[in-house]
Design a protein with these regions (language model features):
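A conserved regulatory-domain signal marking ACT and ACT-like small-molecule sensing domains
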Residues: 1-143
Length: 143
């Protein structure tokens, strides 16, 4: 149930994010979620897109450094404590979350959270056992 996430190396300079998103738009790539982690010189742009393979090919053809990482997507109630419950389930199983970011869903009352863990299979099993629903790549783009 892993989701393919695109990671793009981004130099910290004006216009770089615009360049990346323009390449994706030109190639009909739909961005559903993104997160930027930065340092003083560069950042990592993480994206959930409708066609990860084509996105990476398009970015690389423009000389950009891009790769695919497998992450998990979970559905949480859009209410106080919804995320805390899912994270506690992982913590209780000694699974560390390397990073996470959330975005809205077309489903009223829920949110999607992307999480990066060391062992997707183990985390999936633990989350499912606790009644936490996982999502697949195609689910993210259903209207």
């Amino acid at each position: 149930m892993a989701i393919s996430q695109i990671s793009v190396f981004v130099e910290n300079r004006p216009g770089r994010l615009a360049d990346i998103t323009a390449v994706l738009a030109k190639n009909s790539i739909d961005i559903r979620a993104l997160s930027v982690a930065d340092t003083s010189d560069y950042g990592i742009l993480r994206l959930i897109v409708n066609d990860p393979k084509s996105a990476v090919e398009a970015l690389r053809s423009e000389g950009m450094t891009a790769s695919v990482t497998q992450v998990l997507g979970i559905i949480i109630p859009d209410e106080p404590g919804g995320l805390a419950r899912a994270i506690k389930v992982l913590s209780d199983a000694q699974i560390s979350v390397e990073y996470a970011y959330a975005f809205i869903t077309p489903s009223v009352g829920n949110a999607y959270v992307i999480i990066r863990v060391e062992d997707n299979d183990k985390a999936s099993e633990i989350l499912k056992g606790a009644g936490i629903e996982l999502i697949e790549q195609d689910d993210i783009f259903k209207k």
